[in-house]
C-alpha cells in the first residue's frame, strides 16, 4: 500500500488493515469511515471499480504497468478535444450557451448544478453561470447568438486609455461610447447569473428538456428593465436602505441581478444556494466604514482578449449588493432569488449545508481568494422538519463566524460582531508576507506588510465595532458586508483558496483548498497551517476534514486534519493538481474535479525542468504534466480504497464543474466550463494542433521526455471543424443503464 493511499485512509478515520481486508461492520449502521452510510452500500464496490479508468497523460502507480514499460508506453500521448469517458459510458448535451431558456437564453460558463426531482425520471436542473471568457466569447458571440455587437467601436474608444478602462457611468447619456458599452455590458450580464430548466429521462436513458413554466433565467441585470429584482434579508438590508457616506443606487433594498455565480449547495427542503464569487471583476469590492459602496468609477469598464470587466459600471450597480449567497426555489417560477446577508459578503465558492432536526442550522462556506477564510453561519432558531421550506426563515437571524486554525489540529470559531476583539495575525506568518486590513477612516484596504503595522493597528482599534459605523443593526450589516477584512482584523486564519465545503453523513466537514501560493494583492495562507514538505508555499492543494466538538453544528471549537493529495506520483502525489469540487456517492466514494489555470494545461516542460534562467521550475510551472482538467474517483472501501482513478477529462482549455448525481445514481450531471478559453475556436488542419515536449517522471522518479499532441483551442461540443466552443451541461450515463457508482467491471 502506497504511503499516499495509507495517509488518505487514515485521514478518513478508518483502519488501513480493516479497509484492505474488506472487513466492514455488518450491523447496517454507519462505519468508522465518515463517507460510508451502511455495510450494504459498500458491498457493491468491494470487488472492484465500476469502470475502466481513462488513461491520462501521466504515468500512475495504478496504471497496472510495470515501471520499466511506462517510459515506452507514455513516450507519446495525444490529448482529445472532447469529454473523454471510460468505455461503456456516454454523455448527452442537455443545454449549451445560447439555447433558449424561458424568455432569455442559456448563459455562459456554467458551473454549479443542482437537480431537484419533481417526479419519476423528471426534475428541475438549476445552473450557475459564473463569468465571461473573453477571447472565445468575443470571437464567437455573433456566430452563436446571431447578432453583432459594437466591439470594434469600443476598441477604438479604449485605444487611448488602454487597460485603465473607461468610466462609462459618468459619460453623458447621449455619448455613443456609453451606448456601446451599455449594449455590450448588458449582453455579457445576461450570460451570467443562474438558470432553471426542466428535464426528463426518456426510456433509452437520455435526458431531454421539457420547457415547463418553471424554466427561467435570473441574470446579471434581472430587475433593471423587467422588475424582477432580487430580495435581501438580514442586517445588511439596513445599510442598503440608509443614506450614508458612499454611493447610493437609489434602489433601497432592491437588487439588480446576480453574477459571478460559482458553486453552491442544495437544501433538504428543495431550494438551491448559489455563491457569488469573483464579483470584484464587475463592481467595486471595497466599501466605506459604514458599509456603503465606493462609487462605480472605482471599477471601470475594460475589454481585451484577457478580460471583459467592469460590467456594472455603466449601470451604476452598487458593489455592496454583490458577493452574497443567493437562495432560489427552482419550483417557484416567480422566485428570482434572495440574498441572505447573515451569510456574509465575500468571494463565495460553495456552501456546505448541515440540517438536523432539533439542532440549529449551520452553513459552511469558503472565500475563494488567496488568503480567504472559512466561514460558518449558525441560526438562532432550531430546525424542526429538515424538509420544511420554512427553514429558509432561519437564515434571517443568527451569527456569522470565521475559522481560526491552530497548528496543533484544534481550532475555534470567531464571531464577526461589534464586540469581537481586534487581533490580526502578523504579516510575517503568511506566504507573501502581507495581510489586508480595513483602512480607517477612509474605507477600503490597508495593506500591512510589516509586523509593526499589524501590532499598531491592534493598539489603535480594540474591537470590530471601532472599525465600523452606524447604529447597532447598521454596524452589524457593515461588518457582514466587509466580511473578509473584518475576519482578517479579528484574527481568522488566512487559508489557501478554499473551494468546496462538503458535509459528510457523520456531520464532519470536508474542505478542498486548491492552491497555497500567494498573490501580490491578497497575500497568501498562514504557513504554520498550509505549507509543503519544505515549509514553503504549496501549489497543488489539500483536503481538510473538520469535526465540530461534540459533533454539534453550533459548537465554537473544532478539530481538523489536513492531507496533501495533489502532486506527481514521484513526489507522493495522486496524479492531479488543484482539487476543486467534491461529490460523495451513496457508497461513500469520493468524486472530485480539479481546477488548473487554462494557461498551465499541457504547457511544455524542458528536459531537466529548468527555466530560462537555469533555475528549477516552480510547482505552478510544472502543472503541464497533468494534462487537461479532469474528473477523479477515489474509492473509500474495498481493495482499491484510497487510490485515485481518472474517470474522465474535459475538452481543451476547459474546467469540469458542478458534478451532481441523480438519486438512483444512474446519471451524473456535469458542467463543462470555458472550452477554448485560451485560444478560442480551434482551426482545422495542421494549425489546430501542436506537438509539445513535456518532461515527465515515472512513479519511481525516472525522468523522460514525452511528445504530447495538443489541440489548440476547442470545437466542443459540436466537434466539427471551425465550430464555436460553447460551455454546456451534460448528462453522463452507462450504456447498459446501470448505476454509475456500483456496477462492476465485467
Where are these regions (language model features)?
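N-terminal secretory signal peptides
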Residues: 1-7, 14
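Conserved small-residue
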Residues: 11-746
Amino acid at each position: 500500500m502506497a504511503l499516499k493511499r495509507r495517509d488518505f485512509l487514515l485521514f478518513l478515520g478508518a483502519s488501513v488493515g480493516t479497509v484492505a481486508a474488506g472487513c466492514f461492520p455488518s450491523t447496517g449502521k454507519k462505519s468508522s469511515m465518515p463517507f460510508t452510510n451502511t455495510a450494504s452500500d459498500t458491498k457493491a464496490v468491494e470487488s472492484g471499480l465500476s469502470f475502466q479508468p481513462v488513461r491520462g497523460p501521466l504515468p500512475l502507480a495504478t496504471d497496472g504497468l510495470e515501471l520499466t514499460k511506462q517510459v515506452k508506453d507514455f513516450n507519446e500521448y495525444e490529448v482529445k478535444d472532447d469529454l473523454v469517458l471510460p468505455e461503456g459510458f456516454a454523455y448527452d448535451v442537455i443545454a449549451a450557451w445560447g439555447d433558449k431558456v424561458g424568455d432569455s437564453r442559456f448563459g455562459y460558463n456554467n458551473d454549479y448544478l443542482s437537480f431537484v426531482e419533481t417526479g419519476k425520471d423528471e426534475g428541475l436542473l438549476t445552473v450557475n453561470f459564473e463569468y465571461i471568457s473573453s477571447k472565445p466569447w468575443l470571437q464567437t458571440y455573433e456566430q452563436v447568438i446571431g447578432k453583432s455587437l459594437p466591439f470594434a467601436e469600443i476598441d477604438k474608444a479604449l485605444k487611448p486609455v488602454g487597460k485603465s478602462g473607461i468610466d462609462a457611468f459618468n459619460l453623458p447619456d447621449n455619448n455613443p461610447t456609453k451606448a456601446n458599452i451599455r449594449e455590450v455590458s448588458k449582453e455579457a450580464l445576461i450570460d451570467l447569473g443562474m438558470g432553471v430548466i426542466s428535464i426528463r429521462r426518456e426510456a433509452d436513458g437520455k435526458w431531454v428538456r421539457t420547457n415547463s413554466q418553471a424554466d427561467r433565467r435570473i441574470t446579471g441585470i434581472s430587475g433593471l428593465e423587467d422588475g424582477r429584482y432580487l430580495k435581501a434579508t438580514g442586517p445588511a438590508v439596513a445599510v442598503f436602505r440608509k443614506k450614508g457616506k458612499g454611493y447610493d443606487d437609489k434602489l433601497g433594498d432592491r437588487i439588480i441581478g446576480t453574477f459571478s455565480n460559482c458553486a453552491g449547495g442544495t437544501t433538504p427542503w428543495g431550494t438551491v444556494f448559489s455563491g457569488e464569487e469573483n464579483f470584484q471583476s464587475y463592481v467595486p469590492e471595497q466599501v466605506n466604514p459604514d458599509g456603503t459602496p465606493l462609487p462605480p468609477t472605482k471599477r471601470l469598464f475594460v475589454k481585451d482578449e484577457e478580460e471583459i470587466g467592469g460590467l456594472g459600471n455603466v449601470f451604476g450597480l452598487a458593489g455592496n449588493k454583490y458577493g452574497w449567497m443567493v437562495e432560489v426555489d427552482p419550483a417557484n417560477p416567480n422566485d428570482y432569488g434572495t440574498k441572505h446577508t447573515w451569510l456574509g459578503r465575500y468571494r463565495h465558492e460553495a456552501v456546505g449545508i448541515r440540517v438536523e432536526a432539533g439542532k440549529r442550522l449551520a452553513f459552511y462556506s469558503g472565500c475563494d481568494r488567496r488568503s480567504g477564510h472559512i466561514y460558518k453561519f449558525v441560526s438562532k432558531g432550531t430546525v424542526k422538519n429538515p424538509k420544511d421550506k420554512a427553514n429558509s426563515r432561519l437564515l434571517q437571524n443568527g451569527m456569522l463566524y470565521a475559522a481560526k486554525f491552530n497548528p496543533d489540529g484544534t481550532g475555534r470559531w470567531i464571531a464577526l460582531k461589534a464586540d469581537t476583539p481586534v487581533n490580526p495575525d502578523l504579516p510575517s506568518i503568511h506566504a507573501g508576507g502581507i495581510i489586508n486590513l480595513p483602512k480607517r477612516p477612509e474605507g477600503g484596504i490597508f495593506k500591512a506588510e510589516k509586523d509593526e503595522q499589524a501590532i499598531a493597528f491592534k493598539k489603535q482599534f480594540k474591537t470590530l465595532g471601532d472599525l465600523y459605523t452606524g447604529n447597532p443593526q447598521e454596524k452589524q450589516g457593515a461588518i457582514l458586508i466587509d466580511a473578509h477584512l473584518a475576519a482578517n482584523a479579528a484574527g481568522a486564519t488566512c487559508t489557501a483558496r478554499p473551494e468546496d465545503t462538503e458535509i459528510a453523513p457523520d456531520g464532519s466537514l470536508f474542505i478542498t483548498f486548491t492552491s497555497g501560493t500567494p498573490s501580490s494583492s491578497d497575500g497568501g495562507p498562514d504557513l504554520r497551517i498550509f505549507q509543503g514538505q519544505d515549509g514553503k508555499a504549496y501549489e497543488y492543494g489539500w483536503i481538510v476534514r473538520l469535526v465540530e466538538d461534540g459533533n454539534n453544528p453550533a459548537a465554537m471549537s473544532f478539530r481538523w486534519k489536513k492531507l496533501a493529495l495533489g502532486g506527481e506520483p514521484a513526489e507522493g502525489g495522486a496524479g492531479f493538481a488543484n482539487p476543486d469540487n467534491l461529490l460523495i456517492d451513496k457508497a461513500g466514494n469520493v468524486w472530485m474535479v480539479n481546477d488548473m489555470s487554462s494557461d498551465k494545461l499541457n504547457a511544455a516542460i524542458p528536459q531537466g525542468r529548468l527555466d530560462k534562467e537555469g533555475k528549477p521550475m516552480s510547482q505552478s510551472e510544472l502543472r503541464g504534466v497533468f494534462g487537461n482538467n479532469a474528473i477523479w474517483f477515489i474509492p473509500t472501501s474495498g481493495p482499491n480504497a484510497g487510490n485515485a482513478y481518472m474517470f474522465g477529462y474535459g475538452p481543451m482549455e476547459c474546467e469540469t464543474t458542478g458534478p451532481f448525481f441523480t438519486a438512483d445514481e444512474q446519471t451524473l450531471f456535469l458542467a463543462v466550463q470555458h472550452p477554448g478559453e485560451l485560444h478560442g475556436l480551434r482551426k482545422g488542419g495542421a494549425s489546430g494542433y501542436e506537438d509539445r515536449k513535456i518532461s515527465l517522471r515515472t512513479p519511481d522518479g525516472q525522468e523522460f521526455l514525452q511528445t504530447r499532441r495538443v489541440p489548440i483551442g476547442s470545437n466542443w461540443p459540436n466537434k466539427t471543424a471551425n465550430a464555436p466552443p460553447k460551455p454546456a451541461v451534460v448528462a453522463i450515463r452507462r450504456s447498459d443503464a446501470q448505476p454509475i457508482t456500483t456496477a462492476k467491471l465485467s
